[in-house]
């Protein structure tokens, strides 16, 4: 009986570490959250990049929290969505604000971005930061 219990514990423990193609390790269970751990942002934002927790937005302009100033800034619009993420074993799940769900195998993740058409890169000449208002886009 003890051998069976130890075997089950071993199986559960081994399923708690999964690797992503970003060479980041995420493991264990993550209860539903709007704010995933900082060390997991690279993982979560690689596969659904429109989640609000992936962006620092100020005055209508958003910069990536993962890639920072080395990435293109975007205009804050319908592309940036409130998302909750969770992980149970090897199942990673995104819950997007319109009650849209995306689930994937954590160790075999697939990018998902149905909002890509709404993404608008920020260009200084087109949208000066000081004049940009949310109702302009």
From Swiss-Prot:
TM stretches of this protein: none
InterPro entries, sorted: ASFV_fam_110 (IPR004848)
Keywords assigned by UniProt, alphabetized: Glycoprotein, Signal
Glycosylation sites: 69-70, 105
Signal sequence, renumbered to the chain: 1-20
Function in brief: Plays a role in virus cell tropism, and may be required for efficient virus replication in macrophages.
Similarity-based family: Belongs to the asfivirus MGF 110 family.
Protein name: Protein MGF 110-7L
Species lineage: Viruses, Varidnaviria, Bamfordvirae, Nucleocytoviricota, Pokkesviricetes
């Amino acid at each position: 009986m003890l051998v069976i219990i130890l075997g089950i514990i071993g199986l559960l423990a081994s399923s708690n570490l999964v690797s992503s193609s970003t060479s980041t390790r995420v493991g264990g269970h993550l209860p539903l959250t709007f704010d995933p751990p900082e060390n997991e942002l690279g993982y979560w934002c690689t596969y659904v990049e429109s989640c609000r927790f992936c962006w620092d937005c100020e005055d209508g302009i958003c910069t990536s929290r993962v890639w920072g100033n080395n990435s293109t800034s975007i205009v804050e619009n319908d592309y940036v969505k409130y998302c909750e993420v969770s992980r149970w074993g090897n199942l990673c799940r995104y819950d997007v604000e319109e009650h849209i769900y995306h689930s994937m195998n954590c160790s075999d993740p697939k990018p998902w971005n149905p909002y890509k058409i709404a993404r608008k890169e920020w260009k200084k000449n087109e949208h000066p930061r000081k004049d940009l208002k949310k109702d302009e886009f």
